[in-house]
């Protein structure tokens, strides 16, 4: 069905739903799951974290820690994961990885407002920028 599934990662409820669905799709089809997290453009990584530890749990900041947690979840169901920390706006980061990895599908979550689900700016921007199918959950 799919060889390459791309999903954005944050600690929001919508992103958690998107990751869960992307993980299900990847597991069912034997796809590689590409997990994208957006690193804000402001500033550089802290100078006190040596480069060899930048993307390990020893030097993990928020996005690094999140990617580690999601990798561990995917490993439990034998899904290959490629982590992509990208210094860009979330929609740009997802679209960039989707293009680079020739994604078959991108999975994004909806935002929520007072219990109702709505399509936020990031899913709309992703839909405008990618050339593959987009699943909004």
Show which residues each predicted segment covers.
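General small-molecule cofactor/ligand-binding pocket signal
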Residues: 34-36, 82-86, 135
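Generic structural signal for helix capping and beta-alpha/helix-loop junctions
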Residues: 42-43, 91-93, 115
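Small/aliphatic-rich secondary-structure junction motif
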Residues: 1-53, 129
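Short glycine/serine/threonine/alanine-rich loop segments
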Residues: 31-32, 79, 103, 132
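Structural beta-alpha unit
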Residues: 55, 72-106
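A short acidic, glycine-rich active-site loop
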Residues: 52-65
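Short, acidic/small-residue loops that bind anionic groups at enzyme active sites
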Residues: 129-137
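Glycine-rich, Arg-bearing micro-motifs that act as flexible, cationic patches
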Residues: 105-129
């Amino acid at each position: 069905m799919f060889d390459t599934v791309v999903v954005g990662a944050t600690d929001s409820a919508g992103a958690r739903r998107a990751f869960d669905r992307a993980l299900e799709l990847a597991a069912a089809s034997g796809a590689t799951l590409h997990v994208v997290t957006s690193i804000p453009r402001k500033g550089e990584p802290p100078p006190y974290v040596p480069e060899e530890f930048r993307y390990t749990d020893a030097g993990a900041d928020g996005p690094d820690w999140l990617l580690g947690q999601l990798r561990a979840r995917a490993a439990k169901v034998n899904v290959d994961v490629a982590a992509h920390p990208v210094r860009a706006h979330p929609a740009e980061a997802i679209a960039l990885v989707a293009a680079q990895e020739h994604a078959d599908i991108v999975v994004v979550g909806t935002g929520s407002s007072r219990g109702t689900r709505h399509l936020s700016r990031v899913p709309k921007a992703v839909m405008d920028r990618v050339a593959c199918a987009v699943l909004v959950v």
